[in-house]
């Protein structure tokens, strides 16, 4: 939160809102980390399930949501068993996004929703320059003071792993989310993709 000046709170709430699911819908929070999205899902009267590969992350999950340690590329869920999926800031860590999108499509019921939030690359050259300086130079120094410097050095490099937004949307559409859309948030600092399962 310090690194984003609390903008991450706004981004997560926007992702939950754009899921646009009715109350009591079951939503998987993939790569759930400390459970921030699960908390926001509960506030929206949704029923989150926290999924993360890291037992350490799950043990620090503050949401009190049901949780499972699992690979998000091989979810321990039957086909068409959940109403929605949300994932925050994990796409850039996945090698094969098409496999991930297909797995999401497998477990979401027809008419269910997906919301994927991750870092973005601002289109405005001035904003992009400032963003590169901030995340490339300043954030790693702050991270070194607060916790793990290596993790914060990885952040700006990991952004390069994400395909262009048109590619991401096309991949989501091919996976079974025909109405998939892409929105830049905060001038492109973050990107949000949402879609409905065919």
Where do the model's predicted regions map?
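Conserved alpha-helix/loop element of class I SAM-dependent methyltransferases that forms part
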Residues: 5-23
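Class I SAM-dependent methyltransferase SAM/SAH-binding core
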Residues: 26-75
């Amino acid at each position: 939160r310090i690194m984003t000046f609390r903008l991450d709170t706004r981004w997560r709430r926007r992702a939950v809102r754009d899921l646009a699911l009715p109350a009591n819908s079951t939503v998987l929070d993939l790569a759930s980390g400390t459970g921030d999205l699960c908390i926001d899902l509960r506030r929206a009267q949704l029923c989150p399930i926290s999924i993360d590969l890291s037992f350490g992350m799950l043990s620090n999950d503050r949401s009190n949501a049901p949780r499972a340690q699992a690979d998000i590329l091989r979810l321990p869920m039957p086909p068409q068993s959940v109403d929605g999926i949300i994932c925050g800031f994990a796409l850039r860590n996945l090698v094969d996004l098409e496999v991930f999108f297909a797995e999401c499509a497998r477990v979401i019921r027809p008419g269910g929703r997906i919301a994927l939030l991750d870092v973005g690359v601002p289109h405005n050259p001035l904003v992009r320059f400032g963003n590169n300086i901030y995340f490339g130079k300043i954030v790693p120094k702050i991270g070194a003071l607060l916790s793990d410097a290596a993790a914060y050095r990885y952040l700006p490099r990991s952004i390069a792993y994400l395909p262009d937004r048109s590619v991401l949307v096309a991949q989501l559409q091919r996976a079974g989310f025909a109405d998939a859309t892409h929105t830049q948030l905060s001038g492109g600092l973050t990107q949000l993709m949402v879609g409905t399962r065919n």
